[in-house]
């Protein structure tokens, strides 16, 4: 088979888990560091009395500066008036001039105050000049020059540093406020009651932390498969494949020729749309592929896009419906918008039943997200231009659950059945799957196809793979017919349970049980031939099995064939009863299937004494066995139910009588087959027939049966017309 195409949206996600863990650790570490920085107060605490003392010292220093300046100005004026008559004053003036020529403030002692540190022992802070004080109602802040030193080593001081100080005022009264204001005025320090906004300066760490966390969150969403924009929930999740990514063609699709022929017109329209538009024709807007699981519906849709050479949007019906209201409808609209922009193209919706379920069960006046999404799909399919080159291909295996409005002409105009393949179809599918498998000369694909009745394409692909694995496990250079037969048994009956060892009594009982099935199946002419009998445990509960191989495809069953099947089902438990005068629980599945067959004959097929009537309606899915809770709708009264139970019991009892007669007449063959089973544990059809011929004393077929089934006499049309003319 061809390799699966690669999506353009696909990406490597092998290391996403580890990357997300490192991102989370990085985010937590950054948050801890920033939080520690934010909650740590690096402002120096300065008590209110110490602040007043510093302000008072600053006021004294300011007065000394003003006095010195006044003295300097007076000395300069006297020197200009009479510089030679006063020699002593000239000395003072020269010193004053020298003082002024420099920086007078440097010669004034700077007021200082030493206080112990509030955080470290034996450490003292030497506060000096204040600057830029802001006075608030509850606190005073500003800048202060300080040096730190150890108490026992006052000479070893740290370099001068300018930091922000904080003084808590408590609840000041008017006198204290007035006293502080006078000190501020006298100190000459710049101060204000209205500080300008410093939001960024004070809160930049918080803003930085928020920005880092938001950036990390966006990166983590992208790496975890999320999306970057807040509006991305409404974007379609369909995967876009270009024509180069779709190597699948109709040659890769085998066994469903009728379905391929139905969709060839779609490919021709995408290639030559002008031919249809010029004649006024309209291509179907939608193609619905219906069939059991594994029959190749998705593969057929890929082949359509690969043959047409157009873009291919692939998505599932569950990709639309989300927990957020309105998201599904928005995704539907976005999907069709993208498709129209890339027309001609194909939109493939797999599992359409997840989106298009019938609205008949909805609550009147209620709101359902799935119903809203379905309404959007109905509008888009019937709203966009039919000549736009956008074709919707959908697949489902539950068409009975779809809304009727979705199936009407104008939306899904064409319904294509992709059914289980027949013998010829299975042979073609096997030929496709074994292209890259080394086969032995003994392999016959036709023989494999004949023993795989009911298999779909996915089952056959798994069968070929199992056979190849078995050959590799056994060390063979090529896959032989033996591996294919073993693979069929593994798929149908399950894996061998070699560790499930039965005791000798159970093994003998199982051997008689399976021999009874095989003998009755071989004694009745209207049953499928026996392929293999085994007492090797397989699967979950099977301690042994008898495998039959149909000679041809069957679509109808007669009453005699159903009765023969019931006899084969009952033969196992009757063989146990005949040999051991006791029965076991191993016949549970046989009795269950036999009873259901008898009930179907009475209630569904009209094959009983109650008449040819139908007493129940089948509500099961035609493609999914066992789907749904109630599989049947009862259509009879309680009195009729009693009659049905009696008729079912009568039919089963009659089958028991006939089956017991068959086994009693062939007890010698039963013993021989059982003995051989205990020796080799498995016998094939050839060995079974040899044992029957060697140990059979009379005619093998059951008396009263015929080997050839009756056939209707076909009267030629000319003979019929001549008879009618003679009568007239």
Curated annotation (Swiss-Prot):
A cellular component annotation (GO) from this entry: plasma membrane
Q: How is the cofactor bound?
A: Binds 1 zinc ion per subunit.
Pfam families given for it? Answer: AAA (PF00004), AAA_lid_3 (PF17862), Peptidase_M41 (PF01434)
Q: Where is the composition biased (Basic and acidic residues)?
A: 709-720
Kindly list the cofactors needed: Zn(2+)
| Gene Ontology BP term (one) | proteolysis
Residues that span the membrane, as ranges: 19-39, 199-219
Tell me which NCBIfam families the record gives: FtsH_fam
Q: What is this protein called?
A: ATP-dependent zinc metalloprotease FtsH 2
């Amino acid at each position: 088979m061809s390799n699966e195409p690669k999506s353009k949206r696909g990406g490597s996600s092998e290391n996403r888990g580890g990357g997300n863990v490192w991102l989370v650790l990085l985010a937590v570490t950054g948050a801890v560091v920033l939080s520690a920085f934010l909650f740590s107060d690096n402002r120096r605490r300065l008590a209110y009395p110490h602040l007043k003392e510093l302000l008072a010292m600053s006021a004294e220093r300011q007065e000394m500066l003003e006095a010195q300046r006044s003295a300097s100005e007076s000395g300069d004026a006297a020197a200009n008036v009479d510089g030679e008559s006063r020699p002593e004053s000239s000395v003072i003036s020269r010193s004053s001039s020298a003082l002024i020529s420099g920086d007078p403030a440097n010669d004034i002692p700077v007021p200082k105050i030493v206080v112990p540190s509030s955080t470290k022992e034996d450490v003292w802070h030497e506060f000096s000049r204040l600057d830029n004080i802001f006075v608030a109602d509850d606190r005073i802040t500003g800048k202060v020059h300080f040096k730190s030193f150890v108490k026992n080593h006052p000479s070893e001081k740290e370099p001068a540093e300018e930091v922000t100080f904080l003084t808590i005022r408590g609840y000041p009264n008017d006198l204290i406020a007035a006293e502080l204001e006078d000190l501020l005025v006298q100190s000459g320090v710049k101060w204000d009651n209205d500080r300008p906004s410093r939001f960024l300066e004070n809160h930049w760490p918080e803003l930085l932390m928020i920005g880092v966390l938001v950036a990390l969150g966006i990166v983590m969403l992208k790496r975890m498969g999320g999306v970057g924009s807040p509006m991305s929930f409404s974007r379609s999740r369909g995967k876009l494949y270009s024509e180069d990514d779709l190597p699948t063609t109709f040659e890769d699709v085998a066994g469903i020729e009728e379905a391929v022929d139905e969709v060839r017109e779609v490919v021709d329209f995408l290639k030559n749309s002008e031919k249809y538009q010029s004649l006024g024709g309209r291509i179907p807007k939608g193609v619905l592929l219906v069939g059991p699981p594994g029959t190749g519906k998705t593969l057929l849709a890929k082949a359509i896009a690969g043959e047409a050479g157009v873009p291919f949007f692939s998505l599932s019906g569950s990709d639309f419906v989300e927990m957020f209201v309105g998201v599904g409808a928005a995704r539907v609209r976005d999907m069709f918008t993208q498709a129209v922009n890339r027309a001609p193209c194909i939109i493939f919706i797999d599992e359409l039943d997840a989106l298009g379920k019938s609205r008949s069960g909805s609550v009147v006046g209620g709101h359902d997200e799935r119903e809203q999404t379905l309404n959007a799909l109905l509008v888009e399919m019937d709203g966009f231009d039919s000549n736009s080159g956008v074709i919707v291909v959908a697949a489902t295996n539950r068409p009975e659950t779809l809304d009727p409005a979705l199936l009407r002409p104008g939306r899904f105009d064409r319904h294509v059945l992709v059914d289980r393949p027949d013998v010829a179809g299975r042979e073609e599918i096997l030929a496709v799957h074994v292209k890259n498998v080394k086969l032995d000369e003994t392999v016959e694909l036709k023989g494999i196809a004949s023993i795989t009745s009911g298999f779909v394409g996915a089952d056959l692909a798994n069968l070929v793979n199992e056979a190849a694995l078995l050959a590799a496990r056994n060390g063979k250079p090529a896959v032989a017919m033996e591996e294919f037969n073993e693979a069929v048994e593994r798929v149908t009956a399950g894996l061998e349970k070699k560790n499930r060892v039965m005791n000798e009594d159970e093994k003998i009982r199982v051997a008689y049980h399976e021999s009874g099935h095989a003998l009755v199946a071989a004694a009745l002419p209207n049953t499928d031939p026996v392929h293999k009998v085994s007492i090797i445990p397989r699967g979950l509960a099977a301690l042994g099995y008898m495998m039959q191989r149909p000679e041809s495809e069957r679509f109808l069953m007669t009453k005699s064939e159903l009765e023969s099947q019931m006899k084969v089902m009952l033969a196992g438990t009757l063989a146990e009863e005949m040999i051991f005068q006791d029965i076991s629980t191993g016949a549970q599945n046989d009795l269950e299937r036999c009873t259901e067959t008898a009930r179907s004959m009475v209630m569904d097929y009209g094959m009983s004494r109650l008449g040819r009537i139908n007493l129940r309606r089948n509500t099961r899915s035609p493609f999914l066995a066992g789907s749904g809770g109630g599989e049947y709708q009862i259509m009879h009264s309680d009195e009729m139910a009693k009659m049905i139970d009696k008729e079912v019991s009568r039919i089963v009892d009659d089958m028991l009588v006939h089956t017991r007669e068959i086994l009693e007449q062939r007890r010698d063959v039963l013993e021989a087959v059982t003995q051989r089973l205990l020796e080799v544990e498995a016998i094939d059809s050839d060995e079974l027939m040899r044992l029957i011929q060697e140990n059979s004393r009379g005619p093998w077929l059951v008396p009263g049966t015929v080997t050839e089934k009756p056939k209707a006499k076909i009267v030629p049309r000319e003979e019929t017309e001549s008879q009618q003319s003679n009568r007239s």
